């Protein structure tokens, strides 16, 4: 009888103890709301994706027990199911006893990261990186690398066709092929903190706005008499504003429906001529130590090379050097594109007017528009010749 009573004691203890219930779905399938195939020790989805398949303890405990067990559950219950593992948040795992399990537990949530973070585009093209070049006047004022001094020699080759009356000298044969900052996307350009988008008014509104920013009203104008005077500008500000204006005008020429519109081309020619007038005024700059003439619109602080102050003649030559470099890199490619598009637009207007001879009004408007553009071409060529002549005069000294 004693043996029988002793053998019945373990059975009574086993019936009162309930083993924790393992969930039927693994951790990864339940977190993704996907039906688990429930294979043990690892489901098919985790095996295919190379994931660590874990079957956690179910948190549904059912009815609450009246008495709480004073002694903690033995850790040997986990060893009874060697094919299943327990989540780190439900059971603490000793890293000394099971280092492999603790390492995998740290990697459990890596699949929740967005893989697109590892595929972000990385800029490797040096043309997309804004590299500043040394400037005599402002370290951040001019970013174009100037040409050597001997590049002041001007070729007598015509840039445009022979249909125009004026002669437009070619500044540099390599300027049209040199990469310009206007070829980069508008989102990657710098314009002194201002946006380079055209706004809601369209291309013609942008061209007229650039013309208005570059225009200086006459002091005798009664309408502009009460406006604040901004006639005198800094030399580096002229370079920055002209470069930004030429980049915007070049982007307008990339708009297919607007670049062939004669009204837009007229506004573009006006804005380009205003930018060229500021280059001409920058060559007549008066330094702080020089007397300022009444007609001078640009001033420049003294220039230094280290602690050495440049003389008046050296400063004048340096300004001509920088203006010539910016003409080669920004002005000449825009002018070549403008000449090519305006010539194609004029040919298209003539062909469309000859096919519809019944429309007399369209023929007259296209003829008058082409005549206006031709006049603007000649005026722009004459202004460019004056600027080149000033640079040659400064070079000869």
Curated annotation (Swiss-Prot):
One of its GO terms (biological process) is aflatoxin biosynthetic process. Residues 179-197 have a biased composition (Low complexity). SUPFAM superfamilies: Zn2/Cys6 DNA-binding domain. The keyword DNA-binding applies. InterPro entries: AflR, OAF3, Zn2-C6_fun-type_DNA-bd_sf, Zn2Cys6_DnaBD. Keywords: DNA-binding, Metal-binding, Nucleus, Transcription, Transcription regulation, Zinc. Residues 74-87 have a biased composition (Polar residues). It comes from the Eukaryota. GO terms for molecular function: DNA binding; DNA-binding transcription factor activity, RNA polymerase II-specific; zinc ion binding. It holds the Pfam family AflR. Residues 26-53 bind DNA. Transcription regulator of the gene cluster that mediates the biosynthesis of cercosporin, a light-activated, non-host-selective toxin. The perylenequinone chromophore of cercosporin absorbs light energy to attain an electronically-activated triplet state and produces active oxygen species such as the hydroxyl radical, superoxide, hydrogen peroxide or singlet oxygen upon reaction with oxygen molecules. These reactive oxygen species cause damage to various cellular components including lipids, proteins and nucleic acids. This is Cercosporin biosynthesis regulatory protein CTB8.
